Structure formats: C-alpha cells, structure tokens
From Swiss-Prot:
Sorted UniProt keywords: Glycoprotein, Secreted, Signal
Homology family: Belongs to the alpha-carbonic anhydrase family.
Primary site of residence: secreted
Compositionally biased tracts (Basic and acidic residues): 319-328
Protein name, as recorded: Carbonic anhydrase-related protein 11
Sugar attachment sites: N118
Domain of life, per lineage: Eukaryota
Domain Alpha-carbonic anhydrase, first and last residues per copy: 33-303
Organism of provenance: Ovis aries (Sheep)
Role: Does not have a catalytic activity.
Length: 328
C-alpha cells in the first residue's frame, strides 16, 4: 500500500459533485459509518481514504493530522531502547471466547466481556484492555499489511486493539483522550505452516460461517498467547487509528517476527465478501489505509538495529503471560 495521495482541487470538486449526486439517489448515509477503503462501491460513491477528512468534521485529523498511521518503518531510524520492559499479557487463567464477525471492512474478533484480557509492559505506562482483534489482508501475497518494514509489505496484518482501562471506562472515551489506545500489530506471511491461533480462526468450518457482511460466528476455548511468536522484538511509535476518526491517541507496537498462514487459508480470506449475499461479490481484501508520513516521530525498539543478526534471547524477548485469576 503506497503513500497517501495529496488532495488537489479536482479531487475536492469530484467529492462535492459526488455528495450532491448522493443526496438525490436515496436516504442520507450514516455520517459515522460512511467511509470505505475504495471510493466507488457498486457504482455508488463512498468516501475512500483521500476523502475521509473532508466528509465529516469529526474526522478532520484524517486529512490534517501530523501523527497518522500506518507508516513505513525504516529500520535505520529505530532507536534502541534497552530499558523497554517485555510485553505482558494477562488472561486471568481463562480461555478467550467471543464473536468472529465480517464487518464488511474487516474480519473482526470481538471478545466476550469475560474473561478480561489486558496487555501491559513495553512502552505502555498503563494496563490496556483488549477490545478487538482485526485482520487485514491483500488481494495478492506480500501486499496486505498496513504497515511496512523497509518498504516491504506483508500478506496480512493482525491488529490487537486495546483501550487504557486505568484512565477510561470504554473504547469510545479512550479514543478521544490522550494515552487512550494501544494497538499490537503482528505481520503475516503465506507459507507451508500456520500459526495455531490463526488456524482456529481460519479453518474451513469457521471461516465459511462469515462469508458475507454481518455474518457472525461464536468461538471459545482460544489461547491468545499462541498468537505470538516464541521469541520476538518490537518497534513502537506514537500514531493514530488507521480508520476514521483517525484519532492521534495510539501507541503502536509492531512485533518484528512475522507469523505464517497457509495459501489455502489466505485463499479462504479472499473469498469473503464485503457485501451481503443479495449484492454482487466484492472481496474483503485490500482493506487497509495507505501509508502516512512518519515525519519527525521517533521509532523505538527493544532490539539493537546495529546488530540485526543477533537472535532474540532472554526474558525481554518473550511474551510474559499472567494466568493468575483476576482479583487474586
């Protein structure tokens, strides 16, 4: 996914012409939900990324923000921070359960209210509660992730979206405040083997239950810790939501060791439709925002970029799982 295009006068004129036409075609769209990754869906104009910041005043940061996401990570710019602690995952000793959902834009896993899953450590000063797992993927291998590393994309990107539960009562409030959100991203390649957690989400019996927009399927007995590599480093920076309203309140944590899924699992993802069954098929693939300028933001990592050949060893390069029941 390339860099975000700059808005020009012709683009603005096209937008207002499309808005005028839309006003005469049917009921007005919900302004909080009227966006897409593509400007044209089934012949109807729906604002794509270049227009997000123009169609809704609450989304203005999408157009004028200075700390937007996703970004291309230049490893030469990553500052080694030996004082970054390891990431910690708290599950309360319970298996994860929740609903796998085709939103029409993403494959989304929404965890049940219990158990509460928290992440802390790394660059985070507070404990953050898991709100959603989101899967983005491309129409072709190597071009499905939102973030890139040294100008290289990946076939998919898993984003674990958390809100700061120590400062805010819910995701909506955290989206509007400082230090509100933390998103852990894991990159995905297509290979001969598959990550065990993703295999549960992408096996044939599960993924075919969410073939169309608004389809949902309940899953249980999931071990979230199996999503993470056995050892890994991470890179962190301050950014934004990569969907409207593009709030600049996100601490991004990019895991530097990619996961794998099989070509069959990726093919199954590309067969998911962003429309209900009554409408023409349009693949859910290509569901990512273009790259945004990094500008002068700092990139920090817990691995020394001067010695990339060194393997991740020791407790700082493993996910620390706290499985003690909450409240004990």
């Amino acid at each position: 996914m390339g860099a975000a295009p700059r808005l020009s006068a012709p683009r603005v004129l096209v937008l207002w012409a499309a808005l005028g036409a839309a006003a005469h075609i049917g009921p007005a769209p919900d302004p909080e939900d009227w966006w897409s990754y593509k400007d044209n869906l089934q012949g109807n104009f729906v604002p794509g990324p270049p227009f997000w910041g123009l169609v809704n005043a609450a989304w203005s940061l999408c157009a004028v923000g200075k700390r937007q996401s996703p970004v291309d990570v230049d490893l030469k710019r990553v500052l080694y921070d030996p004082f970054l602690p390891p990431l910690r995952l708290s599950t309360g000793g319970e298996k994860l359960r929740g609903t796998l959902y085709n939103t029409g834009r993403h494959v989304s896993f929404l965890p049940a209210p219990r158990p509460v899953v928290n992440v802390s450590g790394g660059p985070l000063l507070y404990s953050h509660r898991l709100s959603e797992l989101r899967l983005l993927f491309g129409a072709r291998d190597g071009a499905g992730s939102e973030h890139q590393i040294n100008h290289q994309g990946f076939s998919a990107e898993v984003q674990l979206i958390h809100f700061n539960q120590e400062l805010y009562g819910n995701l909506s409030a955290a989206t509007r405040g400082p230090n509100g959100l933390a998103i852990l991203s894991l990159f995905v390649n297509v290979a001969g083997s598959s990550n065990p957690f993703l295999s549960r989400l992408l096996n044939r019996d599960t993924i075919t239950r969410i073939s169309y927009k608004n389809d949902a399927y309940f899953l249980q007995d999931l071990s979230l810790e199996l999503l993470f590599p056995e050892s890994f480093g991470f890179i962190t920076y301050q950014g934004s939501l990569s969907t409207p309203p593009c709030s600049e309140t996100v601490t991004w944590i990019l895991i530097d060791r990619a996961l794998n899924i099989t070509s069959l699992q990726m093919h199954s993802l590309r067969l998911l439709s962003q429309n209900p069954p009554s409408q023409i098929f349009q693949s859910l693939s290509g569901n990512g925002r273009p790259l945004q300028p990094l500008a002068h933001r700092a990139l920090r990592g817990n691995r020394d970029p001067r010695h990339p050949e060194r393997r991740c060893r020791g407790p700082n390069y493993r996910l620390h799982v706290d499985d003690v029941p909450h409240g004990l």
